[in-house]
Design a protein with these regions (language model features):
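Short glycine/acidic-enriched loop and turn motifs that connect beta-strands
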Residues: 62-64, 129-130
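Acidic/hydrophobic-patterned starts of short beta strands in beta-sheet-rich repeat architectures
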Residues: 49-59, 116-124
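Short, surface-exposed coil-to-beta transition loops
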Residues: 54, 66-68, 107, 132-137
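Acidic, small-residue rich beta-repeat scaffolds with periodic aromatic anchors
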Residues: 111-217
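N-terminal signal peptide c-region/cleavage motif recognized by signal peptidases
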Residues: 25-26
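Beta-propeller blade repeat segments, especially FG-GAP/WD-type strand-to-loop junctions
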Residues: 64-89, 139-144
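Blade-edge motifs of beta-propeller repeat domains
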Residues: 32-35, 77-104, 192-197, 201
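Beta-propeller blade termini
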Residues: 38-47, 99-118
Length: 217
């Protein structure tokens, strides 16, 4: 029977997270304390395909600063969630104040979805600044002991102008994909993308890297 993978929230999320944090060891760099109020979203799944239930968290840091993504793999033999990687400076989103005074709840937050092939879909919505908005989606997979970007897609539009939509869907590992844009007359043009495949750790990823691949360079 396949392992069920799903995002979690509310009390269920807090119970799982609290259980996870019980196993943090202060002497281990990856096992840093996490304030539960700063956890934006959590996702369970089997990232390394060993049959255990693993965990991914997106955690706020400070206002105006990028969020962190924490990855845990279950140690099946000893039955605990082991922190294996923290990726910083990759995730933007509005600061969510929850019940803290001086901050409002946000409506621009990253989203996590578990995929059937043990990978993670990370949706990064456009920040509400200016008229040009670009949403990004990354597919993150565990390969050879690290979390890498297996797929990249984006869609952009200038909401103050007509016919400005553009987008791309790229398999980073194979270098194959498709790009498209809306022309001035309202028609849509699509072009195949073919570049050398790459294995890029999530920690080293940049939007410019994905955009360059979509442009065939």
């Amino acid at each position: 029977m396949p392992l069920e993978s799903k995002p979690i929230g509310g009390n269920a999320a807090m119970r799982l997270i609290a259980t996870c944090l019980m196993f943090f060891v202060p002497t281990v760099a990856l096992s840093e304390p996490i304030e539960t109020q700063k956890i934006i979203t959590a996702l369970t799944g089997d990232w390394n395909g060993d049959g255990g239930t693993d965990l991914a968290l997106i955690v706020q840091t400070e206002p105006t600063e990028p969020m962190d993504m924490h990855f845990f793999l279950r140690d099946i033999e000893h039955n605990y969630l082991k922190p294996v990687e923290v990726v910083r400076d990759q995730i933007l989103g509005e600061w969510n104040g929850y019940d803290r005074p001086g901050y409002e709840n946000s409506d621009t937050e990253p989203e996590l979805t578990a995929l059937p092939n043990n990978s993670i879909r990370l949706f990064l919505p456009a920040m509400p600044v200016g008229s040009q908005r670009t949403n990004q989606t990354l597919t993150i997979a565990y390969r050879d002991g690290a979390f890498v970007v297996a797929g990249f897609s984006y869609d952009s539009e200038d909401y103050l102008k007509e016919n400005t939509k553009a987008g791309c869907d790229l398999n980073v590992l194979t270098g194959k994909g498709e790009s498209g844009k809306t022309n001035e007359d309202g028609t849509t043009s699509k072009l195949p993308v073919s570049v050398p495949g790459r294995v890029i750790p999530f920690a080293n990823w940049s939007f410019a890297t994905g955009l360059s691949g979509c442009q065939g360079s």
